[in-house]
Amino acid sequence: MDFTGRNKAIDIIRALTMTLMIFVNDLWTIEYPKWLGHAGMNEDYLGLSDIVFPCFLFVVGMSIPYALENAFKKGRTGVQVASHILTRTLALIVMGIMLQNTGNIAPEVGIAKPVYKLLVLASFFLIWNIYPRTENKNRRLLYKVLKYVGVALLIFMIVIYVDPKGNLIRAGWWGILGLIGWTYL
């Protein structure tokens, strides 16, 4: 089967799902009808919020053949594609764990929660930003230094983290990004 063209149905489902993801992620900030939220553990129904992530996973699954064919058309080998998948998986899992822990940092660390979260997010951008390709050696060196600064910052943020009970960073819940990372495999 040829997967070279855009599939409008997948694009439409992706757009609707992304819109719903933004919407349901902000529901907690307002009063809303019960059916828009998540069903409770012992409730027998699905709220709108309960179907958004499965829809996202469906769209991801439907897009995989297109992404693989596109990668191979660009001349990537199977090893390069597998390496890309593993790297992205690790990145999403690390992001998920870090973001889940940022809201529970102990005051003794000496960094306010919002500042800690901003520094963690800055490290993500420095590490996983797709820097432009260039022939300029100084520019390439700058991009490499920025990535190393991001890695050092992320390691520092992991090392200094302590929650109010004295626990170090841990994966109590992977967070939505971590879950996406695991399903990416």
Could you describe each region identified by the protein language model?
Residues N70-I180:
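Membrane-interface helix-loop-helix modules in multi-pass inner-membrane proteins
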Residues T183-L185:
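Hydrophobic, membrane-inserted alpha-helices
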Residues M1-T102:
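N-terminal signal-anchor module of multipass membrane proteins
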